[in-house]
Regions:
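Catalytic-domain carbohydrate-binding cleft regions of carbohydrate-active enzymes
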Residues: 1-442
């Protein structure tokens, strides 16, 4: 349970009562407005208390769990993604159109299944559709566009790489997920990553489904059969990202800063050059509103780099002609302009802005212009994130703790110390009420 309390000076005791046979439970205590989780898996409980205002608490937390390294500046621009480009030519053609139209773009993303006939996440490009990945990356770089690709911690056991992994006993039992808790498995994964993917000089890495997706680890022993999987399941994404980040810092051929997008996280993951996003979400207004509050909640956990799939991951079948959806997409995009990371993505969708008509394209262009005009501010604030333990996207309570009404603002937030962001979260609105928080310090 997390709770904000004011304590008088002196000694305070915390009493925790637990039973060996408790079942994992998550519930809301209406009387005290608390969310409570308890689990029989943990063998002990440790409490750490951070004192000070919100900024001081966050800085202390990062000092304890590790500072967030500086993001490359291009990671703070526009990242364009869709599910998915199917060929090398298709990806390059869309990148060229961005440049021809003068729509700002820093990074384009190749989602899953570029491995084709070689099997899931075989760490190879299927040359039938991607005949020359090295040339593909080179052409993107000539256009001053970076490339990110999707890489999983799941590997097809029938692939050449999967057979090697399986023969060495590097899988979590009865799954296709690599046992990153086993140092030998983690090192072998990185060895293949380094040899098969790093030579292409790809810029960013999308570690998808790092929960791991769909497979419970209960009754599955990990780390060479020495630990129960359910004990450390939630820590899995931390180990995956640690392996890749440390490898990139050691072996990247150009010595570049690492940028990793991971779907799942754990305390301290910010020290591995990661950003997270809210996963495969819907596209309706309620989903949009929930993403904002969810993102602000994530900011409050000390993980500073976050985004969502602007426009929603699952989209309506008539998305290109549906004007109601166009309005909604615009609101998603406008709001994401003031997120730590700005990214569009969509399931089975050609998400390029020109596919939605001139009006949507022009509004996207306008807000990208705003984003890039803000980039010196964003980059300066990102330095404060790294060196001072600051937070870029901030719930109002972080800056206006004396204003009780600020705590009730679910969707308004500060973007750095200077910008108050007020998303429009309902349809057919030409005006919108803004809450201006009280600041007793002027």
């Amino acid at each position: 349970t997390s709770i904000i309390v004011e304590l008088e000076s002196g000694k305070h005791d915390i009493l925790v009562e637990g039973e060996q046979n408790d079942s994992p439970t998550l519930y809301w205590k209406k009387v005290t407005d608390e969310t409570v989780f308890y689990s029989p898996v943990a063998q002990s409980l440790d409490y750490t208390v951070f004192a000070g205002n919100a900024e001081e608490v966050m800085a202390s937390y990062r000092e304890t769990t590790g500072p967030a390294p500086m993001m490359p500046i291009w990671a703070l621009g526009y990242i364009h993604c869709r599910e998915r480009y199917n060929t090398q030519d298709e990806l390059l053609e869309n990148a060229r159109i961005f440049r021809e139209k003068g729509i700002p773009l820093d990074m384009i993303v190749q989602d899953w299944q570029y491995w084709g006939k070689y099997g899931w996440n075989a760490m190879r490009f299927d040359e039938d559709r991607y005949p020359d990945p090295d040339q593909m990356v080179s052409k993107l770089h000539q256009m001053n566009i970076k490339l990110m690709i999707s890489v999983w911690s799941k590997i097809d056991k029938q692939s050449d790489l999967g057979q090697e992994m399986n023969n060495k006993g590097y899988y979590i039992p009865d799954t296709d997920w690599i046992d990153f808790f086993n140092p030998d498995a983690s090192n072998f994964y990185w060895k293949n990553f380094k040899e098969k993917l790093l030579p292409f000089k790809i810029d960013g890495w999308w570690l998808d489904a790092t929960e791991p997706e769909n497979d419970d680890l209960k009754n599955r022993l990990i780390n060479n059969g020495t630990l129960p999987g359910e004990l450390l399941r939630n820590v899995y994404p931390l180990y995956v990202n640690k392996s890749v980040y440390n490898g990139l810092r050691k072996d990247d051929p150009l010595g570049r800063r690492a940028f990793i997008l991971t779907r799942s996280a754990f305390s301290g993951i910010q020290r591995y050059g990661t950003a997270t996003w809210s996963g495969d979400v819907g596209n309706d207004w309620e989903s949009f509103r929930r993403q904002i509050t969810g993102g602000l909640g994530q900011m409050s956990t000390g993980i500073p780099w976050w985004t969502y799939d602007a426009g929603g991951f699952f989209r309506p079948g008539d998305q290109y002609t549906n004007t109601d959806y166009h309005e909604l997409f615009i609101r998603w995009f406008q709001t994401a302009t003031f997120f730590p990371i700005l990214r569009v993505h969509g399931y089975m969708s050609n998400t390029e802005p020109w596919r939605y008509g001139d009006e949507v394209e022009n509004i996207v262009r306008k807000y990208l212009d705003i984003r890039y005009r803000m980039l010196p501010y964003i980059y300066s604030e990102s330095a404060r994130v790294s060196f001072n333990g600051s937070t870029l996207m901030r719930p109002l309570v972080m800056d206006f703790s004396d204003d009780i009404n600020a705590l009730e603002q679910k969707h308004q937030f500060m973007f750095g110390p200077s910008l108050l962001v007020v998303p429009v979260t309902e349809s057919n609105k030409s005006s919108w009420s803004v809450y201006l928080p009280e600041n007793n310090n002027g």
